[in-house]
Amino acid sequence: YFCPGDNGLPVFQRQNAVIGLLVCYDWFFAEVWKILALKGADIICHPSNLILPGLAQQGIPFHAVTNRVFIVTANRIGTEGSLTFTGNSLIVDARGEVLSHAPAAKAHVDVVSIDLERARDKAVTFRNHLFEDRRPQDYEELLSMP
Protein backbone atom coordinates (compact mmCIF):
# COMPACT_ATOMS: atom_id res chain seq x y z
CA TYR A 1 0.00 0.00 0.00
CA PHE A 2 2.59 2.53 1.03
CA CYS A 3 6.22 3.13 0.15
CA PRO A 4 8.36 6.26 0.06
CA GLY A 5 8.72 8.04 -3.26
CA ASP A 6 11.91 9.26 -4.86
CA ASN A 7 10.77 12.33 -6.79
CA GLY A 8 12.03 14.90 -4.31
CA LEU A 9 9.87 17.96 -3.71
CA PRO A 10 8.77 19.08 -7.18
CA VAL A 11 7.30 22.42 -8.19
CA PHE A 12 6.00 23.29 -11.63
CA GLN A 13 4.42 26.24 -13.38
CA ARG A 14 0.79 25.98 -14.52
CA GLN A 15 -0.51 29.13 -16.16
CA ASN A 16 0.41 31.88 -13.68
CA ALA A 17 0.62 29.64 -10.58
CA VAL A 18 3.53 27.71 -9.13
CA ILE A 19 2.32 24.35 -7.83
CA GLY A 20 4.18 22.12 -5.39
CA LEU A 21 3.47 18.47 -4.73
CA LEU A 22 3.48 16.47 -1.50
CA VAL A 23 2.09 12.96 -1.24
CA CYS A 24 0.17 11.45 1.68
CA TYR A 25 2.35 11.05 4.81
CA ASP A 26 4.64 13.91 3.67
CA TRP A 27 2.14 16.25 5.33
CA PHE A 28 3.52 15.32 8.75
CA PHE A 29 6.91 17.00 8.17
CA ALA A 30 7.02 20.79 8.50
CA GLU A 31 10.29 21.06 6.59
CA VAL A 32 8.84 19.83 3.29
CA TRP A 33 6.09 22.46 3.30
CA LYS A 34 8.67 25.18 3.92
CA ILE A 35 10.91 23.91 1.12
CA LEU A 36 8.05 24.05 -1.38
CA ALA A 37 7.08 27.53 -0.21
CA LEU A 38 10.70 28.69 -0.56
CA LYS A 39 10.74 27.20 -4.07
CA GLY A 40 7.89 29.59 -4.86
CA ALA A 41 4.84 27.34 -4.58
CA ASP A 42 1.57 29.27 -4.47
CA ILE A 43 -0.48 26.09 -4.22
CA ILE A 44 0.55 22.75 -2.74
CA CYS A 45 -1.37 19.75 -4.03
CA HIS A 46 -1.48 16.88 -1.59
CA PRO A 47 -3.04 13.65 -2.90
CA SER A 48 -3.44 11.21 -0.03
CA ASN A 49 -4.52 7.86 1.35
CA LEU A 50 -5.04 9.14 4.90
CA ILE A 51 -6.26 6.63 7.47
CA LEU A 52 -6.08 8.52 10.80
CA PRO A 53 -9.44 10.26 11.25
CA GLY A 54 -9.14 14.05 11.30
CA LEU A 55 -5.44 14.27 12.10
CA ALA A 56 -4.18 15.70 8.81
CA GLN A 57 -7.32 17.78 8.38
CA GLN A 58 -6.50 19.53 11.67
CA GLY A 59 -2.85 20.08 10.72
CA ILE A 60 -3.20 21.21 7.11
CA PRO A 61 -4.52 24.73 7.93
CA PHE A 62 -1.47 25.25 10.17
CA HIS A 63 0.86 24.45 7.27
CA ALA A 64 -1.08 26.86 5.05
CA VAL A 65 -0.69 29.69 7.57
CA THR A 66 2.96 29.11 8.42
CA ASN A 67 3.95 28.99 4.75
CA ARG A 68 1.32 31.30 3.24
CA VAL A 69 0.30 28.80 0.56
CA PHE A 70 -2.98 27.40 -0.67
CA ILE A 71 -3.31 23.68 0.02
CA VAL A 72 -5.46 21.16 -1.80
CA THR A 73 -5.57 17.86 0.08
CA ALA A 74 -7.42 15.25 -1.98
CA ASN A 75 -7.97 12.25 0.25
CA ARG A 76 -9.24 8.84 -0.72
CA ILE A 77 -12.54 7.43 0.53
CA GLY A 78 -13.70 3.87 1.07
CA THR A 79 -12.04 0.69 2.28
CA GLU A 80 -9.40 -1.55 0.78
CA GLY A 81 -8.42 -4.66 2.69
CA SER A 82 -8.07 -3.69 6.33
CA LEU A 83 -7.67 0.04 5.64
CA THR A 84 -10.47 2.58 5.74
CA PHE A 85 -9.59 5.91 4.19
CA THR A 86 -10.93 8.96 5.97
CA GLY A 87 -12.01 11.26 3.12
CA ASN A 88 -12.55 14.83 4.34
CA SER A 89 -10.57 16.37 1.48
CA LEU A 90 -9.76 20.05 2.00
CA ILE A 91 -9.00 23.22 0.13
CA VAL A 92 -7.37 25.74 2.47
CA ASP A 93 -6.36 29.31 1.70
CA ALA A 94 -3.03 30.93 2.51
CA ARG A 95 -4.37 32.29 5.82
CA GLY A 96 -5.61 28.89 7.01
CA GLU A 97 -9.29 29.37 6.17
CA VAL A 98 -10.96 26.18 4.97
CA LEU A 99 -12.57 27.02 1.62
CA SER A 100 -13.94 23.53 0.98
CA HIS A 101 -14.33 20.46 3.18
CA ALA A 102 -15.53 17.26 1.55
CA PRO A 103 -17.51 14.58 3.38
CA ALA A 104 -15.78 11.62 4.99
CA ALA A 105 -17.31 8.86 2.91
CA LYS A 106 -18.77 10.40 -0.24
CA ALA A 107 -17.15 11.42 -3.53
CA HIS A 108 -17.06 15.20 -3.79
CA VAL A 109 -15.91 17.78 -6.33
CA ASP A 110 -15.64 21.47 -5.55
CA VAL A 111 -14.38 24.54 -7.34
CA VAL A 112 -13.16 27.59 -5.45
CA SER A 113 -11.74 30.92 -6.56
CA ILE A 114 -8.37 31.88 -5.19
CA ASP A 115 -6.26 35.02 -5.26
CA LEU A 116 -2.63 34.00 -5.78
CA GLU A 117 -1.48 37.30 -4.28
CA ARG A 118 -2.64 35.98 -0.89
CA ALA A 119 0.02 33.28 -1.20
CA ARG A 120 2.68 35.62 -2.57
CA ASP A 121 2.32 38.13 0.26
CA LYS A 122 4.58 36.67 2.95
CA ALA A 123 4.21 39.65 5.31
CA VAL A 124 2.65 38.60 8.60
CA THR A 125 2.55 42.19 9.86
CA PHE A 126 4.26 45.33 8.62
CA ARG A 127 7.26 44.27 10.78
CA ASN A 128 7.25 40.50 10.28
CA HIS A 129 7.95 38.54 7.09
CA LEU A 130 7.81 34.75 6.82
CA PHE A 131 10.90 34.45 4.63
CA GLU A 132 12.96 37.52 5.49
CA ASP A 133 12.79 36.78 9.23
CA ARG A 134 13.94 33.17 8.92
CA ARG A 135 17.18 32.27 10.69
CA PRO A 136 18.51 29.21 8.82
CA GLN A 137 21.71 29.23 10.86
CA ASP A 138 19.58 28.22 13.84
CA TYR A 139 18.37 25.05 12.10
CA GLU A 140 21.72 23.81 10.79
CA GLU A 141 21.87 21.38 13.71
CA LEU A 142 18.69 19.73 12.43
CA LEU A 143 20.47 18.67 9.24
CA SER A 144 23.18 16.78 11.11
CA MET A 145 20.85 14.90 13.46
CA PRO A 146 19.94 11.28 12.68
What are these regions (language model features)?
Residues 11, 76-146:
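C-terminal beta-strand edge segments of enzyme domains
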Residues 1-39, 47-48, 52-62, 124-128:
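Active-site catalytic loop in hydrolytic enzyme cores
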Residues 42:
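Conserved acidic residues
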Residues 48-49, 74-76:
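Short secondary-structure boundary segments
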